[in-house]
């Protein structure tokens, strides 16, 4: 009997606590965007079915283009329309310039001090200046054109060796990832760690690097419930915090080793690390080792995965739409021909190729929810009150498929970008102060690779079967089934590579 009484009192007080919590929350947060009812402690975490961008699109159809959720104890507002997106990054741009603090940012991103993880302020402005002037300026991007040319030609050579004059089945996914990682790492440090022809001077270092990057990509986008329910941090059932600490130590040791290796060289080369070390000699307070490590890490994580998946989605859609593939090939044959390889100087003339890439970015936005923002003050979005310290997510995937914004919104149709004003609606790289600074580099690298793949080879489906466009769950929108296709060398291969 006493046990039953105790249980009854416990249930009563627990219910009273939950009701009290709901009343306090309702009084504190008035005129919030609408959203589904939340549960005590977990909030709306039970609503978060994967993939999130599709779940959020479904919720926006029920609750409106601006809706709110509770991720445990943290308020989240999701924006799914172009007009509210514009409001966020024009009127509210400064208020939304902060980043939420997640556990991965503490360990992987040097205690929230890297360009993508730090909040708005003097440190961010310094990082943005360094990135714009010393890392991703047009001059610096142009200086790495030889690396991009060499890496894409290595890819073409390997494909040509395997295909020759007859159609042969090719697995493209891993080749595109290898090329993209080598491209970025050569820009950062002059080293190649991927593929059969990677630098053989230290195979163990290359293997350790590949393992490290694989874990970094997994953990940096990990769904960590302790970010939203702090009590779980003490339990850490998934051992996530320990894994974050371990990979943080490995990454820091690797980057420190790279910097020391370049610092002790007699002559500086054309790499990002060497260039920043030269600046460190004259301005050590601005170009510290930690800033150099953070910039290298940001380049590695932001500049690889997204470019590789965009190439894979582009080729997948071209194979599924042979009439579009033919138009790109005809454009290349008209402006470049088969007597020489396409060069970066040709890209401005290849307008249809550019439309294909833009259409791929629209339908298959590499980061469907972009990077999360955090409000530094109370603001208004879509007529609703958004309190300070709210996480704001932009469902770019939903905006890019909004039938009110795009005709035939779910159809792969590159011609849409021939119409004036369409390009301005594309938000794959964000907008405002926190827009991705690497857009220019990414578009140039993607354009060159895609152009060479189409100029140098004929492509077709395996047995006529359409490419499976199913998505894999994750922060980056990757294909569930790795891309395979049939390819055959075109005349330019013999004229350029086999003379």
From Swiss-Prot:
Top-tier EC class: oxidoreductase
Molecular functions (GO terms): heme binding; iron ion binding; isoflavone 2'-hydroxylase activity
Induction description: By fungal elicitor.
GO cellular component, one term: membrane
Annotated keywords: Heme, Iron, Membrane, Metal-binding, Monooxygenase, Oxidoreductase
Cofactor(s) annotated in UniProt: heme
SUPFAM superfamilies xref list: Cytochrome P450
Catalytic activity, as annotated: a 2'-unsubstituted isoflavone + reduced [NADPH--hemoprotein reductase] + O2 = a 2'-hydroxyisoflavone + oxidized [NADPH--hemoprotein reductase] + H2O + H(+)
InterPro entries in the record: Cyt_P450, Cyt_P450_CS, Cyt_P450_E_grp-I, Cyt_P450_sf, Plant_Cytochrome_P450_Monoox
Subcellular location: Membrane
Source species, domain of life: Eukaryota
PROSITE patterns: CYTOCHROME_P450
Keyword Ribonucleoprotein: no
Enzyme Commission code: 1.14.14.90
Ligand binding (heme): 436
Further comment found in the protein's record: Involved in the biosynthesis of isoflavonoid-derived antimicrobial compounds of legumes.
Annotated PANTHER family: CYTOCHROME P450 82C3-RELATED, ISOFLAVONE 2'-HYDROXYLASE-LIKE
Function statement: Catalyzes the hydroxylation of isoflavones, daidzein and formononetin, to yield 2'-hydroxyisoflavones, 2'-hydroxydaidzein, and 2'-hydroxyformononetin, respectively.
Assigned protein family: Belongs to the cytochrome P450 family.
Protein name (record): Isoflavone 2'-hydroxylase
